[in-house]
């Protein structure tokens, strides 16, 4: 089985867990929890600005290096 990563927070999702969401345009999004799904789809939040996501921490590291 292929381990997938969450489309919102960036965590790895073990096979048999998580949520697969298919948009109308055919894009497939994988979520590790309902929290991630609600933040991305329901609340339209961008992962770069949510503090508990991996993308936020990577961006923060880049800012502190410069």
Swiss-Prot record:
A zinc finger (C4-type) spans 6-36. Pfam families: Ribosomal_L24e (PF01246). One of its GO terms (molecular function) is zinc ion binding. GO terms for biological process: translation. Binds 1 zinc ion per subunit. Binds to the 23S rRNA. This is Large ribosomal subunit protein eL24. It comes from Thermoplasma volcanium (strain ATCC 51530 / DSM 4299 / JCM 9571 / NBRC 15438 / GSS1). The gene is rpl24e.
């Amino acid at each position: 089985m292929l381990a997938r990563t969450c489309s919102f927070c960036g965590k790895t999702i073990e096979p048999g867990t998580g949520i697969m969401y298919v948009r109308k345009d055919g894009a497939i999004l994988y979520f590790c929890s309902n929290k991630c799904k609600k933040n991305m789809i329901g609340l339209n939040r961008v992962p770069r600005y949510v503090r508990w996501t991996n993308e936020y921490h990577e961006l923060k590291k880049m800012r502190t290096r410069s």
